[in-house]
Amino acid sequence: MPPRGNEGLDFTPIITHYLFLFTSILAFIAWFTAFIGQIIATARWNGPVGTLWFAIFLHLFLILGVLYTLASDSLATHRFQISVFGAVALVFAVNGANAGLYAEDGALNAMAAGYLILAIVDILWLLFFTAEEESLLFHLFNRLGTGGLTPPSRRRRARSVHNMAPANGYASGGYGAGGGISSHDVATGAYDAKPVSGAFDARSGTASGAFDNKSAGAGAGLNSPGGGARSQHSLGGPTTATGSVHSPRGEDGTGSPLMAQGDMSGAGTSGEFLPKAKALYAYTASPDDPNEISFAKGEILEVTDKSGKWWSARKADGTNGIAPSNYLQLL
């Protein structure tokens, strides 16, 4: 689901996710019961509730905070705060249940029943908001429905990609398909940044971006006297129809980013075995991240990079992209 941000609230995740639908209804009923019980008990006994007045309003703001987090699809942003205040609220809920559960007053009994239900809801919410995506609990909760919520790790990764893109030119054409390297890209250190969409595949030795001879040459000589002539000479090799730069073999080594595509293919993985992974669950790529790939449950993928929580993989039809590692199992 695309991040909603300031585009408004959508309560569909609460309605379609059975866990949140059930716990939200329970939380409101329990809070109202405990609140009315506290009011009556305070009016009758003038003060047996004490600090539970703080607890009842803490639970109110916790419930509203959970609903806002789900409706705004901001798990990655608010899960830590919700977990902290949820743990504090759980302690107060247990104290509230203990304060009136065995009392001989109906109002205190109602208050205790409300806090007991709130404690159960607090535990379920804590288990969800503190569960990592690789954990069994996260998968069990997702079996009740994802609600279209963005997983926390994908949300963080998507933000880092979007924040990085304008700075180094990768997402705007620096290394994108058919994009050329401008002098701005070279001057700002575009070579040192991590590509967004994997324009250069180190395993297959192919490059999807085209290099602009003039702009790359101009940028390469910004920091050295006479650099313009030198860079034009180093980039003076013939250019193919696809825009790849063929530099003289004697000047650019195998580690040069200006290496010819034909030379790159020699460093490929001819005959190299790529590990395969089986999809444990069906996955639909996020529409706001073009790097992700969708796959069906049981589909076999070739894994080209196993580092991190998001693996680079290739489908049987040749589609390349990234996939969440917790959805895959190596064969």
UniProtKB/Swiss-Prot annotation:
The keyword Acyltransferase does not apply. PROSITE patterns: SH3. One of its GO terms (cellular component) is plasma membrane. Residues 1-19, 68-81, 131-331 are cytoplasmic. Residues 272-331 form the SH3 domain. SUPFAM superfamilies: SH3-domain (SSF50044). It is found in: Cell membrane. Disulfide bonds: none annotated. Residues 218-269 are annotated as: Disordered. The chain crosses the membrane at residues 20-40, 47-67, 82-102, 110-130. Keywords: Cell membrane, Membrane, SH3 domain, Stress response, Transmembrane, Transmembrane helix. Residues 41-46, 103-109 are extracellular. SMART domains: SH3. Residues 231-245 have a biased composition (Polar residues). Residues 218-229 have a biased composition (Gly residues). The keyword Heme does not apply. It is a multi-pass membrane protein. Forms homooligomers. Plasma membrane osmosensor that activates the high osmolarity glycerol (HOG) MAPK signaling pathway in response to high osmolarity. Belongs to the SHO1 family. This is High osmolarity signaling protein SHO1. It comes from Schizophyllum commune (strain H4-8 / FGSC 9210) (Split gill fungus).
